[in-house]
Amino acid sequence: MGSSEDQAYRLLNDYANGFMVSQVLFAACELGVFDLLAEAPGPLDVAAVAAGVRASAHGTELLLDICVSLKLLKVETRGGKAFYRNTELSSDYLTTVSPTSQCSMLKYMGRTSYRCWGHLADAVREGRNQYLETFGVPAEELFTAIYRSEGERLQFMQALQEVWSVNGRSVLTAFDLSVFPLMCDLGGGAGALAKECMSLYPGCKITVFDIPEVVWTAKQHFSFQEEEQIDFQEGDFFKDPLPEADLYILARVLHDWADGKCSHLLERIYHTCKPGGGILVIESLLDEDRRGPLLTQLYSLNMLVQTEGQERTPTHYHMLLSSAGFRDFQFKKTGAIYDAILARK
């Protein structure tokens, strides 16, 4: 093969073997490799890591060396032995003690998303999510499927907490929200975004509105230091009365649903919203031609595999919001994974 053919073949193999890279990351997190190395007083050899994570020495060595190639670990040789330690990347994002840890998100992706993606061809053929085929759970009620057990619900909520620990600040500072003293985070889970709002806009008060099971889990498993300013209310935002607010936040909510349900929800928010109030939509925005960014395209395909929705362009969101009655549409690409849209009543 010529050089261009070689390059094309290597690219093909990179794509075909990409799932192996994901599984290395998932497995190392699942086994606790990065936590073990973070807690150790110094670099550890294969035997020590294998003993610490209760795994075979052979398998552990293979996993550690691949993590080195992926720049997740560093290795040094002393006396003919290899000793491993975390890189800055793994220390920041792959240890559970880090404030920017993404371990729960990666575990959720490995246990749930990855398995659903095994049915991608069926999802494309049928145009629907694959919870029934993957887990035997009917998906007529989307979040009944997503929250199919208490453990799965907690895992998903922890994953979202981690997403906003990294991405919350960029989307909440895309616009000056200090003009909205009373906020409501619809579908706000365990309140990670609400906490970030408190730190950025200490004069505001915020209500997290979510279904009863989520509110119960939030109160049981997550800690709060701003109880006097963050209020949890139970309800279904598709049918129950919405809390009064100057600003309604929808973060990673609309992408779960088809246009019809999005329109229904936005109309309910518009009718409840005070005159001059607003709505902040936080999503990963597609380019107008829908051919990028690649990560957002992949997220949109994930919406097919796991939800009823899709990722959308700014124009698509403008249409949904204006049809519900909102005006003064603005959007900002943050340069991070998630972007922000603000509209007013």
Curated annotation (Swiss-Prot):
UniProt feature coiled coil, ranges: none
Effect listed in the UniProt record for changing residue 296 to M: Nearly abolishes enzyme activity
Keywords linked to the UniProt accession: Lipid metabolism, Melatonin biosynthesis, Methyltransferase, S-adenosyl-L-methionine, Transferase
One BP term from GO: melatonin biosynthetic process
Name of a matching Pfam family: Methyltransf_2
Binding residues annotated for substrate, in chain numbering: 256, 302, 306
Active site positions, chain numbering: 255
MF-aspect GO terms: acetylserotonin O-methyltransferase activity; identical protein binding; O-methyltransferase activity; protein homodimerization activity; S-methyltransferase activity
Catalytic activity: N-acetylserotonin + S-adenosyl-L-methionine = melatonin + S-adenosyl-L-homocysteine + H(+)
Keyword Transcription: no
Entry's induction text: By all-trans-, 9-cis- and 13-cis-retinoic acid and by serum treatment, following starvation, in the retinoblastoma cell line Y79.
GO CC, one annotated term: cytosol
Pathway: Aromatic compound metabolism; melatonin biosynthesis; melatonin from serotonin: step 1/2
Tissues where this protein is expressed: Expressed in the pineal gland (at protein level). In the retina, very low expression is found at the mRNA level, and not at the protein level.
EC identifiers of the protein: 2.1.1.4
Phenotype upon changing residue 288 to D: No effect on enzyme activity
Enzymatic class: transferase
Residue positions binding S-adenosyl-L-methionine: 147, 164, 210, 235-237, 252
Result when mutating residue 11 to F: Reduced enzyme activity
Signal peptide: none
InterPro entries listed in its UniProt record: COMT-like, O_MeTrfase_dom, Plant_O-MeTrfase_dimerisation, SAM-dependent_MTases_sf, WH-like_DNA-bd_sf, WH_DNA-bd_sf
Protein name: Acetylserotonin O-methyltransferase
Organism: Homo sapiens (Human)
Organism classification: Eukaryota, Metazoa, Chordata, Craniata, Vertebrata
